[in-house]
């Protein structure tokens, strides 16, 4: 029920270890209309955890500003801020990560093999 497939851009703070990778991504999560009636994309920043062996292929894919497709499950984390508020963030526990690129002919993102 909480499975998700997400196309997103990797942010700068990629942390790779032998058995886990974690990083932030920005994903287009909708559109909104501006005062001048133009439509803009709405971006959401999401923490991603890849709890599998980090091999050379994953290291090559997880470069800042790369476009990736994530297959995984939505979860959440909570922490206490300095003002003692409890904050809940959405995170994705990734099962599969693949590089994507924009195909001009079909106007969609496609997986790079």
Regions found by a protein language model. Name each.
Residues 1-113:
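Single-stranded nucleic acid-binding surfaces, predominantly the OB-fold ssDNA-binding core
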């Amino acid at each position: 029920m909480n499975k998700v497939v997400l196309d997103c851009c990797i942010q700068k703070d990629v942390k790779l270890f032998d058995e886990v990778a974690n990083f932030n991504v920005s994903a287009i999560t909708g559109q909104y209309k501006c005062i001048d009636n133009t439509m803009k994309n709405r971006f959401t920043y999401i923490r991603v955890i890849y709890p599998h062996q980090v091999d050379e292929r994953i290291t090559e894919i997880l470069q800042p500003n790369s476009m990736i497709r994530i297959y995984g499950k939505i979860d959440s984390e909570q922490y206490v801020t300095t003002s003692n508020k409890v904050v809940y963030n959405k995170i994705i526990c990734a099962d599969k990560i693949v590089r994507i690129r924009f195909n001009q002919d079909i106007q969609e993102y496609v997986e790079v093999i």
